[in-house]
Design a protein with these regions (language model features):
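A short, conserved alpha-helix in the catalytic core of glycosyltransferases
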Residues: 102-105, 112-142
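Acidic donor-binding segment of Leloir-type glycosyltransferases
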Residues: 1-13
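Active-site nucleotide-sugar/metal-binding loop of Leloir-type enzymes
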Residues: 21-37
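Conserved donor NDP-sugar-binding/catalytic core segment of glycosyltransferases
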Residues: 12, 46-82
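A short, glycine-/small-residue-rich helix N-cap motif at loop->alpha-helix starts
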Residues: 11-22, 112
Length: 227
């Protein structure tokens, strides 16, 4: 049948990462292998007309395109403004669309904070291309992180550790994100989360080889911005 609704219960806590992917995976488990594109969309989005058709057109255009998405906009005093938390080459976690083979190559989505970064890093590791379309303006009704609870504040630093960023890249990424959110003190939470994860010896989300690729890619992107 065309549509199947699943009812899944969990705690009322708003914690980034695992809960949303557990819900996604529950739906994924209902699928057979007869699909070409798989999407992970949040429920608080309003898409422009022909969003899906435009996404499909990109996948048809180039077989090496593995991940496509538009941009999230939030309501600020009655005006829809770009939710500017990431680089323009990043597809936000709220609106991911994957080619099946790319989705298989990256091993699906990780049940962890940072899942919406590691997916793109692993896609590039497997030589897939990522496309973002500025013309696809998606209204995001609940700004990212607005309802996260206190337990979530160290999760970002934990994610940087589990992505094998290393301390220097973590410091740079933490400072950038804290400034983008206009919450400078978040920087300290991110760094504390990194060291808590290191002390706890939490498992990494990527292999040593993948981690080496990720660090090289991050340094390359930073150098490109400076030059």
């Amino acid at each position: 049948k065309f549509l199947n609704i699943l009812n899944i219960s969990s705690s009322g806590e708003h914690i980034p990462g695992s809960k949303v992917i557990n819900a996604f995976n529950a739906g994924l488990n209902e699928l057979d292998e007869n699909y070409d594109i798989i999407c992970k969309f949040d429920a608080d989005l309003i898409f422009p007309e022909n969003y899906i058709e435009t996404i499909i057109s990109y996948f048809k255009k180039d077989d090496r395109i593995g991940l496509v998405g538009g941009f999230c906009f939030i309501d600020k005093n009655g005006e829809w403004t770009l939710e500017n938390l990431t680089n323009e080459d990043h597809v936000r976690g709220a609106l991911k669309a994957y080619r099946k083979n790319c989705f298989k190559d990256i091993g699906g989505l990780k049940t962890s904070m940072g899942w919406d970064t590691v997916d793109e890093l692993l896609a590039q590791y497997h030589n897939w291309q990522i496309v973002t379309d500025k013309k696809l303006k998606v209204k995001h009704l609940k700004p990212t992180g607005k309802t996260y609870n206190k337990k979530a504040k160290y999760k970002q630093g934990e994610a940087f550790y589990r992505l094998r960023y290393g301390l220097i890249i973590t410091i740079i990424a933490s400072l950038k994100l804290a400034l983008l959110k206009r919450k400078p003190l978040f920087f300290l939470d991110y760094i504390k989360g990194y060291f808590q994860a290191k002390k706890a010896n939490l498992p990494f989300l990527v292999s040593e080889k993948e981690g080496e690729f990720i660090r090289k890619l991050r340094w390359k992107k930073m150098k490109e911005k400076l030059l």
